[in-house]
């Protein structure tokens, strides 16, 4: 295989190569190859590359989201994780304890989306350090309809929510199947 000027050429003895660069990097599946640069032959030990690990996904595929504490990107992670490493800035963000209800607000100073533990009275933005008041009256929560599984949004503090699709009344915080009935 010959490449344009400034690049190395690569000759295969046994095995198959997948790429070649000016930095004298060859990927191959065998250990017997020669790289030629400026007419000189140089043996290159080659090792098979390991297969990248498959990300762990729980059997039911459950995933949650949180905001990176470093760059404020939205991160998705599998249920059960205790911390998440951001692929953009490599910051490790702790996952809130299971059952911790989270809320969101937009920072009044820099308009960054902030996530915080529900019930907090104020939230300080990590970007601009503005202290934002968390108003209880405007907070909403989410629950899946107990009948059709539609994601429903309701005002925090409500005891139940009625689905606009199937008219099913879902009790908030109750286990599925308890005190839930279709509304007429």
UniProtKB/Swiss-Prot annotation:
It is found in: Nucleus. NCBIfam families: LSD1 (TIGR01053). This is Protein LSD1. Residues 65-95 are annotated as: Putative zinc finger 1. Keywords: Apoptosis, Differentiation, Hypersensitive response, Nucleus, Plant defense. GO terms for biological process: cell differentiation; negative regulation of defense response; negative regulation of plant-type hypersensitive response; plant-type hypersensitive response; regulation of cell differentiation. Residues 104-134 are annotated as: Putative zinc finger 2. Negative regulator of programmed cell death and hypersensitive response (HR). Positive regulator of callus differentiation. The keyword Ubl conjugation does not apply. The keyword 4Fe-4S does not apply. GO terms for cellular component: nucleus. SUPFAM superfamilies: Multiheme cytochromes. It comes from Oryza sativa subsp. japonica (Rice).
């Amino acid at each position: 295989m010959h490449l344009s000027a400034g690049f190395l050429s690569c000759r295969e003895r046994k095995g198959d190569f997948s790429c070649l660069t000016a930095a004298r990097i060859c990927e191959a599946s065998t250990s017997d190859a020669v790289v030629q640069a400026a007419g000189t032959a140089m043996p290159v030990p080659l090792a098979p590359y390991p297969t990248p690990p498959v990300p762990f996904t729980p059997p039911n595929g459950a995933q949650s989201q949180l905001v990176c504490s470093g760059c404020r990107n939205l991160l998705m992670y599998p249920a059960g994780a205790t911390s998440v490493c951001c692929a953009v800035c490599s910051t490790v963000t702790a996952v809130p304890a299971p059952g911790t209800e989270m809320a969101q607000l937009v920072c009044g100073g820099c308009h960054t989306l902030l996530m915080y533990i529900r019930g907090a009275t104020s939230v300080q933005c990590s970007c601009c350090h503005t202290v934002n008041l968390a108003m209880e009256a405007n907070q909403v929560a989410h629950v899946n309809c107990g009948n059709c599984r539609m994601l429903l949004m309701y005002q925090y503090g409500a005891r139940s929510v009625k689905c606009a699709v199937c008219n099913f009344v879902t009790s908030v915080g109750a286990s599925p199947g308890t005190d839930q009935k279709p509304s007429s």
